[in-house]
Amino acid sequence: MVFVETRIFTKKCSLYLPDDEFRELQNFLINKPNAGTLIQGTGGLRKLRWSLDNKGKRGGIRVIYYWQLSKNQIYLMTLYSKNEKT
C-alpha cells in the first residue's frame, strides 16, 4: 500500500500525531482501507474517527482519505480535531 499525503495533511499531522501514532494509523489503514465512513457526494472520500491517547474516538481526530483500490494507494487528504470542525 502506498500513502500519498496532501500538503495540508502533512502540516496538520505534525500538530496532532506523533510519529508512532501516525504509523499506527497507517498500519490500521493498510489492514482496513475501507474502515472509514463514505462521505456522500464526494466520489469516494472516507472519514475515519481516530482516537488519540487518553481521549477516545469522540475526543480524537477525524481523518479524511481516499482509497484507490486500482492503484493500491491511500490519499490522505486532511485531518482535524472534533473541536476544529463538525
Go through each PLM region and give its residues.
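Basic, Lys/Arg-enriched alpha-helical interface segments
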Residues: 1-55, 71
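Enriched for short, Lys/Arg-rich terminal
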Residues: 67-86
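Short, surface-exposed coil-to-beta transition loops
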Residues: 59-63
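Residue-level signature of transmembrane alpha-helix interfaces in integral membrane proteins
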Residues: 18-21, 65, 76
